[in-house]
Amino acid sequence: MSRKKGNAADLAPSRKEKKGIGQYILGFFLLLYTLFCFLPVLLVFIAAFSDEKAILENGFSFWPEKWSLVGINSVLKYGDQLVASYAVTIFVTVFGTFLGLLVMAMFAYSISRRDFRLSRFLSIYLLIPMLFNGGQLSGYIIFTSYYHMKDSLWLLILPLCVTTMNVIILRTYIANSIPNELMEAAKIDGAGEYRTFFQITLPLLKPSMAAVGFMMATAYWNDWQNALLYITSDSKKPLQLLLVSIQKSIEFLLNNTNVPAAARAAMGGNIPQYSSTMATVLVVIGPIMVVYPFFQKYFIKGLTVGSVKG
């Protein structure tokens, strides 16, 4: 017995130390790919702090001839409105993601139960929006004329709250990764459906919910079309719609030949078309880039674990 243990101990270090040349080659190409993906983000950051005249004369560069804060200031000058839009976007993103995850998790749980009579009907009902779409006009008429929800934050939350693909991801995870015997045991112990869902299924569903939640949060964060259709108050204007307004105001200045000389001098002699565009991109992607690394492992695990039946 001791000899067998000794042989196993001798083999263990050799397995750890052995690394084929293929792993080094793979690591090298992955490093190159990482740099390839990071360089555009770096260029956006540099261009946001570049002088507009230098961009017009020499194009975008990783080391511009002249640095300038005109582009970023053209966005930050909206101070109070920018803070209010950030607050609206964060609220819509957090609350919409939480509400959507709760509703979709309950929906996915119900259609994953084999003993639920309406499981097949609801599964077919779930697929209808993927095949048929009423379009924006019908949705606009229903929300504004019948529900009277014009200029309401609910119209930034409800349209993206439930999506077919996210429900399918959650349902697949429940069916493939959570043993049905666990739910049957809870039922035998006297647990109802709500208790089984909240105390057993929901805690085990966290990896998949993290993946779906990140995709939902990204969709809410980048949504500007619903705000453009339904929001009219400045106090309810989300970040994306504000940035669209900033870009339109810059385009107006570019197309207006009667811009005062003092205004042009304040902008460095040139209207910051490209630098301000990069500054708006930086304002948008900054928070997502900060948050994503913390959810990356859950995002990958949630998409892969439920895809293979164990």
Where in this protein do the model-derived segments appear?
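A hydrophobic, multi-pass inner-membrane permease signature
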Residues: 2-310
